[in-house]
UniProtKB/Swiss-Prot annotation:
Taxonomic path: Bacteria, Bacillati, Cyanobacteriota, Cyanophyceae, Synechococcales
Family: Belongs to the UMP kinase family.
Gene3D superfamilies in the cross-refs: Acetylglutamate kinase-like
Protein name per its UniProtKB record: Uridylate kinase
Keywords from the UniProt entry: ATP-binding, Cytoplasm, Kinase, Nucleotide-binding, Pyrimidine biosynthesis, Transferase
UniProt GO MF annotations: ATP binding; UMP kinase activity
Description of how the protein assembles with itself and partners: Homohexamer.
Protein residues bound to UMP: 51, 71, 132-139
Role played: Catalyzes the reversible phosphorylation of UMP to UDP.
Binding positions (ATP): 9-12, 52, 56, 159, 165, 168
Biological source species: Prochlorococcus marinus (strain MIT 9301)
Length: 234
């Protein structure tokens, strides 16, 4: 395996599959099976999950909600996804802990950096829910922050496209895929792969970002192996 400690960023939409809303149990099971293969190879894996399949703070704000309130609702959506993911992982025999940035002791541990790292060292998967606990920050930024905190070697951004393009491949047939690109190129060209705060955090801490297609079976293992299946930002 190319990497020994990995932060996997899963969008909420990844858990939705073909559904218009919510969580597709079959997709969760497929992701869990891929993750189990990674853990079997003694890779320490932490996961940050988004909430866009249930509620997106920015959209709530655009629809008239107070932005901070909308973001807090979005944070709760990420916890719902984290618990669902934990259930899927434990069904395939992967010991999993959920840690949340906002305390909810009846259903998850509070986020404690040292405890999270100890879980990883013991071979458990740690799923981070609740974003970073503050409004106005995306779950991509949370992924970059947690990766830096737990000393992850890479951020794996699992998404619905197979890499980073110079324009939307779903809209433009001549869209060019990058096999690799720099943090600065992403920032200066305003390439919409992650928000600028997340990119800058990874840049400042020398954490590469691998962007790949989550819906292709086995891609998580391939990405962790270092296979060139997506786009590498470094």
């Amino acid at each position: 395996m190319a990497y020994k400690r990995v932060l996997l960023k899963l969008s909420g939409e990844a858990l939705m599959g073909e559904k218009p809303y919510g969580i597709d149990p079959a997709i969760v099971q497929s992701i869990a099976e891929d993750v189990s293969k990674v853990v079997e190879n003694n890779v320490q894996l932490a996961i940050v999950v988004g909430g866009g399949n249930i509620f997106r703070g920015l959209k709530g704000s655009a629809d008239g909600m107070d932005r901070a309130t909308a973001d807090y609702v979005g944070m709760l959506a990420t916890v719902m996804n984290a618990i669902s993911l934990q259930d899927g992982l434990e069904r395939v025999g992967v010991a999993t802990r959920v840690q949340t940035a906002i305390e909810m002791q009846e259903i998850a541990e509070p986020y404690i950096r040292r405890r999270a790292m100890r879980h990883l060292e013991k071979g458990r998967v740690v799923v981070f829910g609740g974003g970073c606990g503050n409004p106005f920050f995306t779950t991509d930024t949370t992924a970059a922050l947690r990766a830096a905190e737990i000393n992850a070697e890479v951020v794996m951004k699992a998404t619905k496209v197979d890499g980073v393009y110079n324009c939307d491949p779903n809209k433009f047939k001549d869209a060019k895929k990058y096999s690799s690109l720099s943090y600065q190129q992403v920032l200066s060209d305003e390439i919409a792969v992650m928000d600028s705060t997340a990119i800058a955090l990874c840049k400042d801490n020398n954490i590469p970002i691998m962007v790949f297609d989550i819906f292709k079976k086995g891609n998580i293992s391939k990405a962790v192996d270092g296979d060139p299946i997506g786009s590498l930002i470094s």
